[in-house]
Amino acid sequence: MGAQLSLVVQASPSIAIFSYIDVLEEVHYVSQLNSSRFLKTCKALDPNGEIVIKVFIKPKDQYSLRPFLQRIRAQSFKLGQLPHVLNYSKLIETNRAGYMIRQHLKNNLYDRLSLRPYLQDIELKFIAFQLLNALKDIHNLNIVHGDIKTENILVTSWNWCILTDFAAFIKPVYLPEDNPGEFLFYFDTSKRRTCYLAPERFNSKLYQDGKSNNGRLTKEMDIFSLGCVIAEIFAEGRPIFNLSQLFKYKSNSYDVNREFLMEEMNSTDLRNLVLDMIQLDPSKRLSCDELLNKYRGIFFPDYFYTFIYDYFRNLVTMTTSTPISDNTCTNSTLEDNVKLLDETTEKIYRDFSQICHCLDFPLIKDGGEIGSDPPILESYKIEIEISRFLNTNLYFPQNYHLVLQQFTKVSEKIKSVKEECALLFISYLSHSIRSIVSTATKLKNLELLAVFAQFVSDENKIDRVVPYFVCCFEDSDQDVQALSLLTLIQVLTSVRKLNQLNENIFVDYLLPRLKRLLISNRQNTNYLRIVFANCLSDLAIIINRFQEFTFAQHCNDNSMDNNTEIMESSTKYSAKLIQSVEDLTVSFLTDNDTYVKMALLQNILPLCKFFGRERTNDIILSHLITYLNDKDPALRVSLIQTISGISILLGTVTLEQYILPLLIQTITDSEELVVISVLQSLKSLFKTGLIRKKYYIDISKTTSPLLLHPNNWIRQFTLMIIIEIINKLSKAEVYCILYPIIRPFFEFDVEFNFKSMISCCKQPVSRSVYNLLCSWSVRASKSLFWKKIITNHVDSFGNNRIEFITKNYSSKNYGFNKRDTKSSSSLKGIKTSSTVYSHDNKEIPLTAEDRNWIDKFHIIGLTEKDIWKIVALRGYVIRTARVMAANPDFPYNNSNYRPLVQNSPPNLNLTNIMPRNIFFDVEFAEESTSEGQDSNLENQQIYKYDESEKDSNKLNINGSKQLSTVMDINGSLIFKNKSIATTTSNLKNVFVQLEPTSYHMHSPNHGLKDNANVKPERKVVVSNSYEGDVESIEKFLSTFKILPPLRDYKEFGPIQEIVRSPNMGNLRGKLIATLMENEPNSITSSAVSPGETPYLITGSDQGVIKIWNLKEIIVGEVYSSSLTYDCSSTVTQITMIPNFDAFAVSSKDGQIIVLKVNHYQQESEVKFLNCECIRKINLKNFGKNEYAVRMRAFVNEEKSLLVALTNLSRVIIFDIRTLERLQIIENSPRHGAVSSICIDEECCVLILGTTRGIIDIWDIRFNVLIRSWSFGDHAPITHVEVCQFYGKNSVIVVGGSSKTFLTIWNFVKGHCQYAFINSDEQPSMEHFLPIEKGLEELNFCGIRSLNALSTISVSNDKILLTDEATSSIVMFSLNELSSSKAVISPSRFSDVFIPTQVTANLTMLLRKMKRTSTHSVDDSLYHHDIINSISTCEVDETPLLVACDNSGLIGIFQ
């Protein structure tokens, strides 16, 4: 712009700089970035974000910038294609100034060097590598930058470098050596006096000769400047030259190697790299390409060249756009780029196996060696095995396994891990996580960060990864919050070293954030709190370990004199930590949600260890013992399963005073699973020796009656406890003390081991006996059997002993002894009826009431000699039953009761409430609102197709007419027509015709904008017989969706009579007609209406539907179509609506239309009027570019369904009546694309065949996949059809094996019944065994069978199919397999089929070729193109076969 420009430019502008910006359209001035005299740099906003504007204020109005701007524009256009360059996107000249505009980035390289976290060595190397590649690309375009410095190198948040502010046409090439003012004016805009210019650019002679602008910049000048930049970044921001040092260096009076490089750089390779770039002689400076080749594998790691750089360059190009021709920028907006980071994160996730291979991460192939080549895309799994709860599975598209280890262990073996190259990916992922839109992608990002964190040092784990996990605590999605918490703990678990800056990370940073996370989620769902509670103990372990690290470092770094100070600070820090963890623990212990408490209990032992014995007693145990009274038995079970471990930690005193008495009381819990857990815990405590001998006898007396309990687990654990006690006692103690207690419960004396004792235990009482005993204990009133004796005896746990009345005791105190008048009066009116004996031969008196109960026991199977068993269980049952009695939901009287872990549902008292029947009536609105009732009756009579309606007007016994027949549609009751109202004395069941209570608007044209040619929608009125005024009931009744059956919809026409399937056994294969009207357009689908007037429907790839009158064609009267309908798009499928003159058509534009064929009888001829569109829907409303490729229709009194398979392998089910979408079934993509479908005769089962040879069986009632299998060589399955001849559970499968025509399977049992082999060689039986496991791991056959079948048709016991290669048609006879034959074949060979019984369940039909004639075959009688569709029908009792091929030819065979 002129060598002497510095002399004429104003020292300061006459007006404020923002006034120059205001003249620009759609630009808002923000601030001024520098105060340079040459170019004023401002920050502004435009519609697409922040921009930088460099303003050149013209020294005079006539000063023209056009030649400069043209050259800058041409240069920017070339540079716009490079990912390392940020060019000027807009250049503007006004009469006062020139403007160069580009995008604004926050940081340049100079700023980044001083920001935390500081760049690591591998990142500095990668930045230098990027800059050399960027400069190489620029020089390859014959462009020179001219002003490379750290301020002109922009850096993204993940350290991708971008060169900007090219100065070749803006600033002078040469500067005077004696005037530093020129350098300050043009190049020292930051006023740091740092010089990056090559020494040869300071040349006074060339400057004075006027070549400062006309001189040519050289590539060597850029190399020198870049060498200065690389030296500065490795010197932690210290510049290699200022202006005076550069002059000294030029005069050889400054030794840069000794005075700078040796001081700042330890690496000899780095020093040599810089020296090769800053040589005084430009010719000795190496080019970028030479530098990269020379230092490959020496200074720059080899994986920079082979993988890393290219991979990140691809990521950059994914997030940017390339300018179109003649433009320097694109108009990409922020809205367009909102999901770009989602795409790049997904790419890293998909490419993880490739990343591991290229960086030598310890990736192990499942069943293979380290680093082996990946197989074809299947499944990839990473298992994190560092922490107890973090055995997380990450799924990637490769079949590999990664065992993550501590950094120190891996870095010793692998160079790339030691260099921490994973930091490059961590920088990218961590800075993108907050801008990711999709929750699923954000979860993948967290998983990747957790995995990559294992390959960086402990310091970088904390500084570079942990903050981003913590920032995800603020995310609105609980899945993200929970996974961020899990990954945080996982990463911290592997940390083994701490630096001084991170010593207080928990107190100052993590714990306050965790508390805030917990508080902020109080009002949300419990998922996060459950995860947090489960992780708390692991967090406590990490905190404890960090404390140990900190203390050890202080002891090593300080002298003994400072030990007191260290101890004090450590004590304060520990107190804060313990208090914070205590607050979190109490919060979880007192949480309102049971599952949060259970999650804490699952891993509470490390937390107890963290607090120590005293604090555990005060904080944890005091809360835990209250859980035994909780209503939720699952919580009680969790506590009891944990309590034995806590007991070991707390010791015998706490066990005997608190824990053991509570466990003994809990043996009588109402839930048997709780009792099992108690017995299991007692067994563990006995085994560890924590329970002293003084408790053995009382525990034996309490538990030994449980050997008669009906629960098998309770009996076994009771026996295990007895065996543990026996092992702890001496032989004398066993036989003198324990043996008398347990002997009654065994048949005979045995050895004291589990196997012997379990085999000779007395038979337990049955469940019905036990439940009746519980019921008796609660309901007993005048009973001596349950009468307890008041006693002051207590056992060793402080519980009162239970003693019952015996005959001796009652005789002494109640029956004959008059001294105890108080006790006698309490039994007044009670008379003994008989006695029973206990297991210790004591007589127990019974009252008459007791005797009645005993008789009940006899009735349910308890013999008289086994009555002692219920006597022995009295003490246990009376405690258990009292607990049950406190629970109003417990079913005492149900003899079939089986206890469950979960609480029983609320027991509503329905004793005096009778069920109420509510009837629904449904009719079309125009019928219900019409004034003339006669016309309604007429219409109803026209559409009476159900035989049950014929007797609907018969009189009942009382002479009144019966109500009309009620039918069941979708689980609700409706009337077929109105009847005269009746009265009855039972007001709960009266039906009265009410006014319409709700209108169900069902549009048959859902989702369409243009419905001009579609039948208008019809309103349906639904009324019910409810006469009450309870709002909740009325609201509930209004939720029922009731529709009339399809036969009541007039637009579908009258229902056809059931026409039997044609008898194809008489088919001879004679060609009687050839229709060529459709040539050369391919016929893609066809169908035949089987009614009284059979007609053929064909659809072509041009979207034309044609209707053909088969009767007239056979007679020879016409050979053209009767009707034509244009669908405007390729027809993919035609399917008939059963029992109606209507059919459904799907096309590639996403449309599904239902057409009705209108025709009438004129004398003996049938005249076709038109095709009327009665329903229409567009699948593009549900999915982009989606259309149906297969359809099936099903109609009965309850359902009218249209099942459509789309090109996206989704199955969509519609209601034919309204074309409303009912459900979507999405099959697993791992099973392959769905290629064929069929439904069973009850429309409950959907059968899918896939391109990977897998058969999937779905229950469409519950949208559940119930079975999948493959067989053979897994060839693609092209057709599946229901085979009713062999039963409702049989399905015909074409495909799966390249050796068969087809196979017939029982899809319920999953075995092959028949196999139709396409050769005379019998395959192995294993070929037809179902493979149900490991379907995703099978090697699938990607090609179809050589004898591929193009289409199939099933008619009763006949299966007709076409051979794609020969266009022959084969007919298999299921009734007589040996009579199967090729009915239409152009070959000189005939097929002979030989049935072979292989097993009782499998029959094979082998095909054998046999020459039939030596004469030539008349080719005109056969199809010469692929047959796309075949159909069968019967006209005047003559079976017909209609075949339509790819050339548009229709052949009719008789």
Curated annotation (Swiss-Prot):
Annotated phenotype, changing residue 151 to R: Modest effect on activity and normal CPY sorting
This enzyme's EC code(s): 2.7.11.1
Ranges occupied by HEAT repeats: 460-497, 576-613, 615-652, 654-691
Mode of membrane association: Lipid-anchor
Residues anchoring lipid (N-myristoyl glycine): 2
GO BP: autophagy; cellular response to potassium ion starvation; late endosome to vacuole transport; macroautophagy; pexophagy; phosphatidylinositol phosphate biosynthetic process; positive regulation of transcription elongation by RNA polymerase II; protein retention in Golgi apparatus
Xref: SMART domains: S_TKc (SM00220), WD40 (SM00320)
Main location: Golgi
Keywords assigned by UniProt, alphabetized: ATP-binding, Autophagy, Endosome, Golgi apparatus, Kinase, Lipoprotein, Membrane, Myristate, Nucleotide-binding, Phosphoprotein, Protein transport, Repeat, Serine/threonine-protein kinase, Transferase, Transport, WD repeat
Record-annotated Protein kinase domain positions: 27-300
Summary of subunit composition and partner proteins: Component of the autophagy-specific VPS34 PI3-kinase complex I composed of VPS15, VPS30, VPS34, ATG14 and ATG38; and of the VPS34 PI3-kinase complex II composed of VPS15, VPS30, VPS34 and VPS38. Interacts directly with ATG14 and GPA1. Interacts directly with VPS34.
Function field: Serine/threonine-protein kinase required for cytoplasm to vacuole transport (Cvt) and autophagy as a part of the autophagy-specific VPS34 PI3-kinase complex I. This complex is essential to recruit the ATG8-phosphatidylinositol conjugate and the ATG12-ATG5 conjugate to the pre-autophagosomal structure. Is also involved in endosome-to-Golgi retrograde transport as part of the VPS34 PI3-kinase complex II.
Protein name: Serine/threonine-protein kinase VPS15
Taxonomic classification: Eukaryota, Fungi, Dikarya, Ascomycota, Saccharomycotina
